[in-house]
Design a protein with these regions (language model features):
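N-terminal and secondary-structure boundary signal
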Residues: 1-328
């Protein structure tokens, strides 16, 4: 089978072996964000700090300069601002003493365009040449499941972009109907539209607010509403474009619902182990394949949402879900 190698480890020693096979020497001398979710208050199923420390140690041994990283959330609560999330991380055991590196919570971003959608990637991720994405695999009521793609697609961007991914919509223009009246240009608060040289949109500026569609009186403007799965894939790709990434998925405490839910429901699949790979689509596909062996279609049955849809969209954007599984 073509594609990348995904290493399967049953315990912490196996994770260490998988990381040693992942050519971390290329991280030498570089700042290496380790992107993870450090837990919602009330949810007991977040990544273990001990697992984070294993990755921190491996990156340090390779000459890299790691730091744990996540972004503030868009919904109300303690994790909606940096100081609150820092307190949550501390209570959950993510401290410099316990994990061996700094813990950084991001609030700001850098605007990029991916698949004609403008998003704000967290500044710390945008500035990094490389990163490790450490993800807890679990169900998700809207996306079917959460793994590496979900971790990046929602957790790697700013509050505004989180909201946009959840309610992804892109204005579409019909030149055959348009009269170049300029009402859409006047209505746009982001100054993303112009008609001086024909109708044009600057996707880097567009916020997807819909005011241009509302202002149009000819029907030349409409919304193309995307699924959350595609929005997550686009956002994840924006976070990793031109970057060197190692992915670690934890298939432990596989809960019914997301890490952001203070009441995540029950465990829906026995613990399986850990996966380490170099492609988000491949490691998520391998995660679902292993879970399906233990609990066939458990996420689809629980949520009614196909968990593989986000992987298919990721492949369309350039990721590769083909993999060879290698146990270590």
């Amino acid at each position: 089978m073509s594609g990348s190698t995904v290493y399967f480890a049953r315990d912490d020693d196996g994770v260490r072996s998988a990381l040693s096979n992942s050519s971390l020497a290329r991280f030498a001398g570089k700042a290496v964000p380790i992107k993870l979710h450090m837990g919602e208050p009330g949810n007991p199923y977040f990544i273990r700090p001990e697992l984070a420390r294993i990755i921190v140690t491996a990156v340090k041994d390779a000459g890299g300069h790691p730091f744990l990283f996540d972004t503030v959330v868009a919904y109300p609560g303690e994790r909606s601002h940096r100081h609150g999330y820092e307190r949550v991380a501390y209570r959950h055991g993510f401290t410099r003493d316990s994990v061996g590196c700094n813990v950084t919570i991001g609030e700001r971003g850098v605007r990029v365009v991916e698949a004609e959608v403008a998003l704000e990637v967290a500044t710390q991720l945008h500035e990094a040449d490389c990163m490790v994405v450490l993800s807890h695999v679990k169900g998700h009521v809207q996306a079917g499941f959460g793994g590496a793609i979900k971790n990046l697609g929602m957790g790697g961007v700013t509050k505004a972009s989180k909201r946009r991914v959840h309610f992804m919509s892109v204005p579409v223009h019909d030149a055959g109907i348009c009269t170049n009246c300029g009402l859409c240009v006047t209505a746009c608060p982001s100054h993303a539209l112009s008609i001086e040289h024909g109708w044009r949109i600057d996707r880097r500026k567009c916020e997807g607010c819909g005011k241009c569609v509302t202002a149009c009186q000819t029907g030349a403007m409409r919304f193309d509403v995307m699924s959350l799965a595609r929005g997550l894939a686009i956002s994840a790709m924006a976070c990793i474009r031109n970057k060197d990434v190692v992915y670690v998925n934890s298939l432990h405490n596989i809960a019914e619902n997301c890490d952001c839910d203070p009441s995540p429901g029950g465990i829906v699949c026995p613990d399986i182990g850990y996966l380490v790979g170099s492609d988000a689509a491949a490691i998520d596909a391998a995660s679902l394949d292993l879970i399906d062996r233990e609990a066939p279609d458990v996420f689809l049955r629980n949520t009614g949402v196909d968990p593989r849809e986000q992987i298919r969209h990721a492949v369309e954007l350039g990721m590769d879900c083909q993999y060879s599984l290698c146990e270590v």
